[in-house]
Amino acid sequence: DDGWFGDKYRRVQDNSSLGDWVVDRKKLPNGLENLIQTADRNGIKFGIWIEPEAVNSKSELFEKHPDWALQVKGRPLQYGRGGTQMLLDVCNPEVQDFMFGIVDNLLGKHPQIAYIKWDANVELKNYGSTYLPQDKQSHIYIEYHRGLNKVLERIRAKYPDVLIQACGGGGGRASYGVLPYFDEFWVSDNTDALQRIYMQWGTSYFYPSNAMAQHISASPNHQTGRIIPIKFRCDVAMSGRLGMELQPSKMTKEEYQQTAQAIKDYKSVRDVIQLGNL
């Protein structure tokens, strides 16, 4: 998850290190390989969190390439999450190569990685590009997504079998424009099962269930504080692509039993839920 990376600037808070996609050896002295091997020994496929489109002003990447961040000439930079986060200028082919390299380096060194959570936690705040000519500055949204699609096309051409989730502050990446490249999108950061019923029902009017990531989460819920029985949480999450957002060390015996049964039941009907015709 978020926090595995950073060298000169370690990712100990959310205000640094985005762009510096190297393993934090103080946190992980044996690197990612040890984690991957541990997961494999326990019969679990390994997944990793990245946010390739973003950069922190407190990062080695920004120190080396300040022109790689979206920016308006003559205006101060506007920051998002952590007071330091910005979007990279994906219009720029050099930035596109860098972003592809993030994924290519990870999967090249660690071919056992089966899942990527591609996050996006800052909106476009600086409406300018140092790469685009003056007459294209008004096309920043269009050129940004054209550049992003070029990166994603390269990733999918080389790594067609890796499962990639489009996450973005909740449903920020729920879009048919990204579904050719992503296997699923995160419906919402709000995982309260009662509220999720309404969200998932509404989303299902526009998107198929096999594109909707729906996870069993903790109780009390982290977003609403609501206490919800584990059976109800499982049942609601089973209406799309079932996943887990639970810390095993904090799970009760009942939660272990119910989630194990839910996963077993889900596998028996997964083809119908994800691919069935109504």
Which residue stretches match the model-derived regions?
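Polysaccharide-binding and catalytic clefts of secreted carbohydrate-active enzymes
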Residues: 3-4, 8-10, 18, 82-158, ...
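Glycan-recognition and catalytic regions of carbohydrate-active enzymes
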Residues: 245-278
